[in-house]
């Protein structure tokens, strides 16, 4: 099965060209993207190479994506089912609920079902973006929600973004410097 979509569907963020990367992430000699494909509420596994998806399907369905300047093409295996008669979904957004800037304090998010976000890797040394996240805000109440199918992070309460994101070289010193910068940030780390 294959679908080709215009890149305009994704706007300025295309999860099928967005690689998972960052401090303490080991890609194991293959690319991993923040995009995903779902069949009836379950995700398929990203294949490392297109040939893996073109082979007969095994027990676990696979998908693979390619992005050029105009189009995104996604191949997927749907063993034993016609995807045109099932619920097939893809990620198109990085987050579901995430403020556009830090300092959006005292927000309550209660009673929602939130799914399918193409979130980046969220080490303690980079801006932590989740399917739902506070973006360096305080006083939030996040309760009685269903949060699922986020590539890297479901709920993120952590770090603001800065030019030092993912530059710690996986060291304790880099981690400590991140904490020092958090205390010195324009919106300081406080209760």
Residue ranges of predicted features:
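Extracellular polysaccharide-degrading/modifying enzymes targeting complex plant/algal/animal polysaccharides
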Residues: 1-136, 141, 148, 154-157, ...
């Amino acid at each position: 099965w294959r679908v080709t979509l215009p890149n305009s569907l994704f706007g300025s963020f295309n999860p099928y060209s967005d690689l998972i990367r960052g401090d303490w992430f080991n890609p194991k000699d293959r690319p991993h993207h923040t995009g995903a494909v779902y069949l009836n509420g379950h995700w398929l596994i990203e294949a490392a190479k297109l040939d893996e998806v073109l082979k007969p399907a095994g027990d676990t369905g696979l998908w693979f994506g390619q992005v050029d300047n105009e189009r995104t093409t996604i191949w997927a295996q749907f063993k034993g089912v016609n995807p045109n008669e099932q619920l097939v979904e893809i990620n198109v957004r990085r987050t579901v609920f995430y403020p556009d800037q830090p300092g959006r304090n005292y927000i309550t998010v209660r009673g929602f079902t939130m799914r399918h976000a193409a979130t980046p890797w969220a080490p303690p040394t980079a801006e932590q973006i989740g399917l739902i996240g506070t973006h360096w805000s305080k006083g939030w109440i996040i309760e009685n929600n269903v949060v699922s199918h986020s590539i890297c992070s479901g709920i993120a309460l952590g770090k603001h973004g800065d030019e030092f994101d993912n530059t710690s070289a996986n060291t304790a010193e880099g981690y400590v410097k991140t904490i020092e910068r958090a205390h010195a940030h324009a919106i300081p780390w406080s209760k």
